[in-house]
Amino acid sequence: AEPGRQGDTSAATAQAFGSGTLAIMQRLRVAVVGCSGTGSVVVEQLARTGIGTLILVDPDVVEHRNLNRIVNATEQDAELRTPKVEVMRRAIAAMGTGTKVETLATSLFRPEAIRAVSKADILFGCVDTVDARHLLCQIGAFYLLPYFDIGVKLEADGRGGVEQVCCSVHYIRPGGGSLLSRGVYSLDEVRAAGLLRSDPTYLADQVARGYLRGVQESRPAVISVNMLAASLAVNDLLARLHPYRLEGNESYAAQRVSLSHDLFDHEADGAACTVVGRGLGKGDVEPLLDQPEFSEPS
């Protein structure tokens, strides 16, 4: 940003939440994993709100089929197969807000991505596979990082109508509950998602034998619902930096919205997760996260 311009772009945030909160935000390093339908909106909001540095992780490129939901992506990006993280970098640079950007056009399941994300202060997960969501919970535990998990679910009723439209935001604090302990997924589902990524043939065999359930690989996505979920998550972050809710933040460990059923509820954290909690505060270990999959060449 040009001299003097960054202060101008941040003035509204300071007016709403105070100069002290803005100063904290400008020092924060926030990792956003997943830069598609929900992640691109989160990135847009964080950059314009005044976050100092964004670490962006996504292995995919822009395609025509997702132009309906990736903020700042263009038809030319789809033609050129521009990496999604580069679309985000370009957009943030054009904003002139002064937000620094680090990008990794690779899978979170690469050691270099885990190391980059571990250097953040806060994690945002905008991914739809349970193994990636579980991995983010583990990274948060090992490196004592708070994690905001965003989920969006649209289901058709098979008759041309809609069964449900809903979204959720989970705040996972180190040493507390996890997505696993809250019942968002099971370890069998994590295993199945991992096999889909690493050995889909073996997964198909296990499903055929009845040992594992299949994995739904894609869901419909609508930008308006993605934006609702992203805004809920970013506002949750703001509430934790500058408390503004009538109820304390401890009552908002999980927030759920159903547009189809006209519901909004929130709840406090439950018992600590004994599975994810095994790595609490371990930090850098060999192999990373105590998992041979993430062994690095010496």
Pin down the residues of each PLM region.
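Short loop/turn elements that flank and shape the SAM/SAH-binding pocket of Class I
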Residues: 109-112
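Conserved acidic residues
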Residues: 105-107
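Glycine-rich phosphate-binding loop and adjoining beta1-alpha1-beta2 segment
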Residues: 56-96
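Residue-level detector of anion-binding/catalytic polar loops
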Residues: 52, 100, 146
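Glycine-rich adenosine-cofactor-binding loop
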Residues: 18-63
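E1/E1-like adenylate-forming module used to activate ubiquitin-like modifiers
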Residues: 103, 114, 119-228, 245, ...
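Internal hydrophobic alpha-helix adjacent to the cofactor/substrate pocket in enzyme cavities
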Residues: 227-247
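N-terminal charged helix/coil linker that caps or initiates catalytic domains
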Residues: 1-31, 252, 292-298
